[in-house]
């Protein structure tokens, strides 16, 4: 099995797998290196219960694949037969036989075992990719909710300040009850929105805890990683042959090819060698024996035909996997590029047209009514929320591109 390692220029690395071959068995240590969310992703990769179960299943499959790499056990038979009628001497027959498996003798069965090990590793990697992709997206969402909660906390503080200001004005006779009720309602709505965002963040924290094997995962970040900029599309395309989906299809083709070669070898007449002895009083007969199967009914031809059909299906699956990965990458890359541009454009416009300080001053100076202030403030807050969502969507799109490379 080739070591699976993606270039460091491709957002994230699959990592190096330690291999040791012993009688056709390959062991893999699921160690991984990341360039994004390094600490969190390594912790999840180490603690995730699904990956632990899949890794144990991988080792079980490797042991099972190596179980048929030796010749079948020899057979021994001893028969003691009494003479009849009375006076006939008893006879003892001894038979020892060994079946010769051409698949074992030619090494074809061992090669199939190694190919099956590679396929098992590829299956594990597909499961690994799915877990890491889910974790990556969940971490992006957690940053979004941290940013959203921080934004909503600022809005709540602003709403409370305005409410306190109007309570004072109301007590001084400078504001009426309608205006006071409006700012109180605005404060209640701000607090409710914050509590809803915190509830969503708590639910997402449970998802991260599940991915982390039941252990809570601290994720206080409010900024996205600086390494989430998309690399050139050509660089990503160079890494496509190493992705989990393509690797699994290639391993399946390798396994089916090895199965065809084994089926051809097993089509040869199967030999059995041994020793036979017949022992009677004063008369002993013994010597070597040999037997063979006669491929008369066409079972072997049907097995070879079936193996070839599986091989053709694997070839088509590999072509489909490569095309699918290529199409998926192009689609996700275009989507990520467009969403990044949209988020950046919105941020630029919002930074250039910020009116929050001016609105507060106008309200305090009495140049703006409470209703107009709340409407203008709501419009500005909607734009801020749209920016947070646009940045999140852009980061999720980059996360999907990154997930292809796990």
Segments predicted by a language model, with ranges:
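Acidic, low-complexity, intrinsically disordered peripheral segments
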Residues: 1-7, 13-30, 38, 216, ...
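Periplasmic alpha-helical coiled-coil/stalk elements that build and connect Gram-negative outer-membrane
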Residues: 22, 130-242, 332-335, 339, ...
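Outer-membrane beta-barrel domain signature
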Residues: 87-88, 92, 192-195, 199, ...
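Short, charged, amphipathic alpha-helical segments
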Residues: 111-114, 177-186, 370-378
